[in-house]
Curated annotation (Swiss-Prot):
EC numbers for this chain: 6.1.1.19
Upper lineage: Bacteria, Bacillati, Cyanobacteriota, Cyanophyceae, Synechococcales
Gene name of the record: argS
Keyword ATP-binding part of the UniProt annotation: yes
Name of the protein: Arginine--tRNA ligase
Protein's GO biological process: arginyl-tRNA aminoacylation
Length: 590
């Protein structure tokens, strides 16, 4: 009901201006969706903050506003008579015929009432970002699917979105790994197919142990880093092969999860690192402290009360993550050809990096690298925990590999499906079982994560996420399947030109819920909280199921049939669209 609320907001502002033409206070109707159905569709709470400046009781102010609204023909065509409640709230109910018109305008459309944003702007979403020579684990799950969902919503709103994978493809670890492989398995550096990622991870662990225990190996590794940074062809070839092998393994997981990303690793920004120092020097932010080049933060102090530094060049002349992140921010906001010209840059990482990004963002802001009106945002998320409330681990105490987690989700989904088929005495092909199990299993993993407020930790449970009841992917997928079954039973779900007619309260409840979709999408775009969309889709499914269980559809009277089928069609379209924005495909049968 976004367009209706915007119209209503303008009408309320005009009424307030007419009621209080001499008011010096800001006249804001404070229009919001009604908190309960009995309060109507919207509530205007703007009378309360005017009580003090106008020196009038809020109910008296509300009455004056309502008196002005009563003479507004356009308002009367949109709303029923407003009601004043409590200390001065104005409850507003949209006329049923306007709700039906609004729904009719959305039927069969691709956008389902969601407007394209007026100010289209380039957006960068930085997410996933695994490290080369390491396998993706459960910790990468949240960044990958939260970032993908946010990118999908921003794209749906009309923004040009650059989905960046800031992979860890540079640093001391490569000197360490290349040195180790040259010494113990030189054949692995001949071709990218000579070693798989699992072996590479094992080699990395061996190299790390040698680096920590052996001073000579450590020195040789540092020399290898210098060669790599200097462009030594042998070192660069070895580095490229390691990156290619990891990249192929990452892509298998991205394909499986239907994730699109443009890789732009840390190494991309190497040529831009000296300019970071030059830029900070130019605005007198750079300070030498104990041989290192730093920027001291404003308003952030350590235990000793002194300002904390962001180190951008170590005392040995090397750069670090902060330098790379500053170079990335500068590039992403800069104009082409040496930048992305973004107006909004979003980083999706775990909450443990909040202080790091707060510091880096402050430095970039003070350096003048963030254009006026542009947005630079960190989207933090909590940990994935086991059912014991501790960080999710394997029984052996290792980090859970993402590949293994997805495999188990699909396996459990298939077990549940085969059990259900046996109970229902249904026979399905192996291809059907495989397709449904894969779709439901992966959807369950995604939805279980996205349905949680990303700011909190959440407990991972296969049993809960695969349940057919509750706020789960299977429950939502089944709602779509249920509607698809109407067509199989002879219901025409095609778009009809017949006027929509509703009489039952369950119908109107569903109409109102369907019309909330546009507002929810705009909220997710602004607040970057995918769980808002999940909550809406779950509520929509519940409202639809109550409608379908309590009101006849296929056996409806002729005058009601087409309108009820239209409700079913639009519910399915909304669920499919909403789930697609979460990266979840739907099914026709389960």
């Amino acid at each position: 009901m976004l367009s209706l609320s915007q119209t209503l907001d303008a009408q309320l502002r005009a009424a307030m201006q007419r009621a209080f033409p001499d008011a010096e206070a800001t006249l804001d109707p404070q229009l919001a969706a009604a908190s309960k159905p009995e309060f109507g569709d919207f509530q205007a709470n703007g009378a309360l903050p005017l009580a003090k400046p106008l020196k009038q009781p809020p109910r008296q102010i509300a009455t004056a506003i309502v008196d002005q609204l009563s003479g507004d023909e356009a308002f009367n065509a949109l709303c029923l008579a407003p009601q004043i409640a409590g200390p001065g709230f104005i409850n507003l109910t949209i006329r049923p015929e306007r709700l039906a018109e609004e729904l009719a305008a959305r039927l069969g459309t691709d956008r389902l009432g969601v407007p394209v944003v007026e100010d289209v702007a380039p957006v960068v979403v930085d997410f996933s970002s695994p490290n080369i020579a390491k396998e993706m684990h459960v910790g990468h799950l949240r960044s990958t699917i939260i970032g993908d969902s946010l990118a999908r919503v921003l794209e749906f709103r009309g923004h040009s979105v650059l989905r960046l994978n800031h992979v860890g493809d540079w640093g001391t670890q490569f000197g360490m790994l290349i040195t180790h492989l040259k010494q113990v398995a030189p054949e692995t550096l001949d071709t990218a197919d000579a070693v798989d990622l699992g072996d590479l991870v094992a080699f990395y662990r061996e190299a790390k142990k040698r680096f920590d225990d052996d001073d000579d190996f450590q020195a040789t590794s540092r020399d290898e880093v210098v060669k790599l940074q200097g462009g030594d062809p042998v070192s660069l070839k070895a580095w490229g092969l390691l990156c290619d092998q990891s990249r192929r393994e990452f892509q298998k997981l991205y394909d499986r999860l239907d994730i699109r990303l443009t890789e732009r690793g840390e190494s991309f920004y190497n040529p831009y690192l000296p300019a970071v120092l030059d830029g900070l020097k130019a605005v007198d932010l750079l300070v030498t402290d104990d041989g290192a080049q730093c920027v001291f933060l404003e308003g952030v102090t350590g235990k000793d009360g002194n300002p904390l530094p962001v180190i951008v060049q170590k005392r040995d002349g090397g750069f670090n993550y902060a330098t790379t992140d500053l170079a990335a921010i500068r590039f992403r906001f800069a104009s082409p050809p040496t930048g992305d010209a973004a107006q909004r840059v979003i980083y999706v990482t775990d909450a443990g990096q909040a202080n790091h990004f707060a510091g880096v963002f402050q430095v970039a802001e003070r350096a003048g690298w963030i254009p006026d009106g542009a947005r630079l945002e960190h989207v933090p998320f909590g940990l994935v925990q086991g059912e014991d409330g501790k960080k999710l681990k394997t029984r052996a105490g290792d980090t859970v590999r993402l590949r293994d987690l997805l495999d188990e989700a699909v396996e459990r989904s298939e077990q549940d499906l085969r059990s259900r088929l046996q109970e229902e005495e249904r026979t399905e092909s192996d291809a059907f079982i495989s397709h449904v199990a894969t779709t439901v299993g992966l959807a369950a993993v995604k939805y279980a994560d996205l349905s949680q407020n990303r700011l909190t930790n959440y407990q991972f449970s296969f049993d809960r996420m695969l349940a057919l009841q509750g706020n789960t992917a299977p429950y939502l997928l089944y709602a779509v399947v249920r509607i698809a079954g109407i067509a199989r039973k002879g219901g025409d779900l095609g778009v009809s030109n017949a006027a929509l007619q509703f009489s039952e309260p369950q119908e109107w409840a569903l109409v109102r819920e369907l019309l909330k979709f546009d507002r929810v999408i705009v909220e997710v775009e602004d607040e970057l909280l995918p769980n808002r969309l999940c909550s809406y889709l779950f509520e929509l499914s519940q409202v639809f199921n109550r409608f379908y269980d309590q009101v006849p559809v296929l056996k409806a009277e002729p005058e009601a049939l087409s309108s009820r089928l239209a409700l079913c069609r639009h519910t399915a379209d909304t669920l499919r669209c909403g789930l697609a924005l979460l990266g979840i495909p739907t099914l026709e049968r389960m």
